[in-house]
Amino acid sequence: PLIVIANHPYGILDGLTLGHILEHTRVDFRILANSVFRKAEEINRVVLPISFDEDKEAMALNIATRKRALSYLEDGGAIGIFPGGTVSTAVRPFAKPMDPGWRNFTARMIAKSGASVLPIYFDGHTSRLFQIASHTHNTLRMGLLIKEFGRRVDTPVRVSIGEPISSGALSAFAKDSKGMMDFLRKATYELSPDPLKSFDLGYEFEERHRM
């Protein structure tokens, strides 16, 4: 079994690109992604939907999806996921966009499945307009995601693929979900072709996840 993790700088483009990478390397893969991705016909068939809402329906959906994902991994499949759970956003509008802290949901799935983990780094970020809008109006932010995707059509995406990390190498984090995700987040950002000066957390939209 394999879990592919990646940063999430674009929202739509990196989701499609991750699907493209997995499609050309594995026949047995699924992607855990926001249910909105099911509207994209080309990847709907491989999406296991997750929701970041805080209601009972979202909780039930996520529990069901995790069960399906674990079952898929038990059969030796591959799962792709963006552990940050949201598009990389700068803490301040003119700072560097980064993922927030990575969700423990992924760590629990890694620990339960015993899967190896493959980190992938997507280089780049959304426009400054999107970053500013992200701090002012959530509906505008979501609307601009489509424009961000259109802006990048037919442009290259720099991708760095790391070495697989065995379940044994992560065994020290078996009871430390946050520690595991901090380790994997840093390992992913270290793949940047232009070394980063900082691995600071990006803006966290969900109050329950704020430090």
Which role fits each region the language model picked out?
Residues 1, 39, 203-205:
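A short beta-turn/loop motif at secondary-structure boundaries
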Residues 1, 16, 41, 51-54, ...:
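Solvent-exposed, flexible loop/coil residues
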Residues 3-58:
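Catalytic core of membrane glycerolipid acyltransferases/transacylases, capturing the structured
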Residues 62-211:
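Non-catalytic C-terminal accessory region of glycerolipid acyltransferases
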